Amino acid sequence: MLNKIKNNIFLKSTLVLLIGGVIGKLVGFVLRIIVTRKLGAEGMGLYSLLAPTSSLLSVIATLSYPTALSKIISEKSSRTKTLFTSIIPLSIIINIFIIGITILLAPTLSTLLKNETLYFPIICLSLVTPFISISSIIKGYFWGKQNMFPYMLSNFIEQITRLILITLFINKFLSISLTHAISFIILVNAAGEVVSQLVMMYFFPKNIRPSINDFNKNDIKKVMDICVPSTSSKIIGSISYFLEPIVLTNVLMYVGYSKDFIVYEYGVINAYAMSLLLMPQFFTQNMATSLVPELSKYYSLGNNEMCKKRIKQIVLISCSIGGLSTLIITLFPTFFLNILYHTTLGLDYIRLLSPFTILFYIEYPLINALQALGKSKSAMKCTIISSIVRLISIASLSLLKIGMYSLILSIIINLLLSTYLYTKEIKKVLSN
């Protein structure tokens, strides 16, 4: 068994990611508990309202670089040196535009969210994106080489950095205001990304030093050919997620709910219910990451049977992890909420969501599988359909005056639909 693992790069990469993921997630989870306890339901509500904007900016900034670069590097279709020399300048230009546009739109966005206090935190989100972008480019190299240790170690040290900074200074910013504390937490992410980059660069081959002479337009085209359809799918999903709190807040206020109620309950759902139910989701995300280069390689060789085998393995493991964790949390929700967050808020939301939570765990591997199979356009089509349905369901269900249950029900509808669509597309691709 040990010899089999040693000789199987996919298994080694997955195991390294899982072990490193557990360690990194434990630190990240401690950090999340500290932040949640410090900010409270109201603070987490405000922080959660910013999460969709953060997700959208990150998707645009990273442009699916890890997936694209890992695919190109694993197929050995370009020189690594020219890849980095070509992509980094493009990334810098894109991030300058992101910062400028975000600063211009921040007042409008904070007004749409019915919370003008979010103006400065929104600007802080844009200032973090360049650091996230550069990190994603470096990660793409190690993913393509299926060398997951540098990525794992950098992720762990990044979390430790964030934990130390937030533990030391969060109270000082809270004494000023919730807005200052939230802005500080956002900016700490930039410090974590810088530390992560330094760790990964230590493991980077010394012979790869980007030079202006290595700039290659063809490399940009190769990366963009993968990034554009792949990112288009993610951007559509992120735009839907971005519009979620705007649509939800405005429709619920229209039918009579107060702004304070919406912020508070939105915080309860995201900070307590969803956070608890999705605790082990990093397992499936890490496995899906290691799946991309492996699946790309077999698909390029025309080995559909091996592709099916790998996808089935990941989905089976994901279902096992998701099913077991959901069962335990569903049986003892009060215990976990009390011990982790010192609250019992979110119990009803957990009970309603738990039967469908397993779909969260298999959704990410299915999306990555489609992208690895070169079917980013199919993934985009599925995302467009499910995103439109989600927004329509949020708006229409909110009109029924059922409070935040309109959001819960729309999440369930979206999960069922998107899982069905992704599965259908994968079967179609591999049946040819």
Give, region by region, the residue ranges found by the protein language model.
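Helix-terminus/linker motif at the lipid-water interface of multi-pass membrane proteins
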Residues: 26-43, 110-111, 173, 235, ...
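Signature of the first transmembrane helix
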Residues: 9-66, 96-99, 103, 229-251, ...
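Alpha-helical transmembrane segments of multi-pass membrane proteins
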Residues: 100, 115-137, 165, 187, ...
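Helix-loop junctions and terminal segments of transmembrane helices
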Residues: 62-77, 274-302
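Membrane-interface helix-loop junctions in multi-pass transport and translocation proteins
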Residues: 146-150, 160-197, 374-377, 387-419
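N-terminal membrane topogenesis motif
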Residues: 1-27, 85, 217-237, 241, ...
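Membrane-interface junctions at transmembrane-helix termini in multi-pass inner-membrane proteins
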Residues: 131-154, 355-385
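Short membrane-interface helical motifs at transmembrane helix boundaries
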Residues: 97-116, 324-343
